Regions:
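N-terminal beta1-alpha1 cap of cysteine-dependent amidohydrolase-like domains
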Residues: 1-78, 84-92, 96-104, 111, ...
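Conserved acidic catalytic centers in enzymes
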Residues: 79-80, 134
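C-terminal and late-domain segments of enzyme folds
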Residues: 13-14, 120-190
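Short, flexible active-site-adjacent loop segments at beta-strand->alpha-helix junctions, enriched
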Residues: 81-82, 116
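Residues at the C-termini of beta-strands that transition into short coil/loop
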Residues: 26, 114, 161
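Short hydrophobic/aromatic residue motifs in ordered secondary structure
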Residues: 82-83, 137
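Alpha/beta-hydrolase-fold enzymes
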Residues: 96-128, 132-133
């Protein structure tokens, strides 16, 4: 949990609903407890006064998160957590202001692109409805990075309609190629 996180309790409740035993870890801690999964929640870490997630990516706890991920541990970032993982260098690309420069708060659909990983291998559905609330969720990367992401099958989720059709009309923030979520090359960071 970082100063300004406001979805940490929501994430705690959601994970408990699925049978996870959770422990909240503060940004100033230096060590992670023994874990199967590290989740970086949404919110506005450090008020998002600089680039979203940039200050949190330099927090003391992030050294342990980086080491955990590099050792093969599973890490997931949601909303501001995604921004933090990008800023920390665990995921490629950047997250920019939304295409129409407005805060977006609504339900959207995403289509799972890659089930060859521990996050989605047991999912029966291909399309999920999620709630989003962000000002800087526009995923962008260079052409070279995009080519590498495609070659390594790193796109986890695409924005889609309820039936799983991927198109620009269902892309709420202008993300390149309608990308809603990505993996690292090893597919242990989402």
């Amino acid at each position: 949990t970082f100063p300004g996180s406001n979805c940490d309790r929501d994430m705690d409740v959601a994970l408990k609903k699925f049978g996870f035993k959770n422990k909240m870890v503060w940004h100033d801690d230096q060590e992670l407890p023994k874990s199967d999964l590290i989740v970086l929640p949404g919110g506005f870490s450090y008020g998002d006064y600089l680039r979203c997630g940039s200050m949190a990516s330099k927090s003391k706890i992030m050294k342990s998160v980086l080491n955990f991920a590099k050792g093969g541990g599973k890490v997931m970032g949601v909303c501001n957590g995604f921004q933090i993982l990008v800023e920390a260098g665990l995921l490629p690309g950047v997250l920019l202001r939304n295409k129409y420069l407005r805060f977006i708060c609504k339900n959207i659909f995403v289509k799972v692109n890659n089930k060859d990983n521990s996050f989605f291998k047991n999912t029966k559905k291909d399309t999920f409805e999620f709630h989003i609330a962000h000002n800087e969720g526009n995923f962008y990367c260079s052409k070279e990075q995009l080519k590498e992401i495609d070659e390594n099958n790193q796109v986890a989720l695409f924005y889609s309609d309820k039936s799983g059709n991927i198109n620009d009309q269902n892309n709420p923030n202008g993300s390149i190629n309608n990308i809603a979520g990505i993996f690292n090359k090893e597919k242990n960071v989402l």
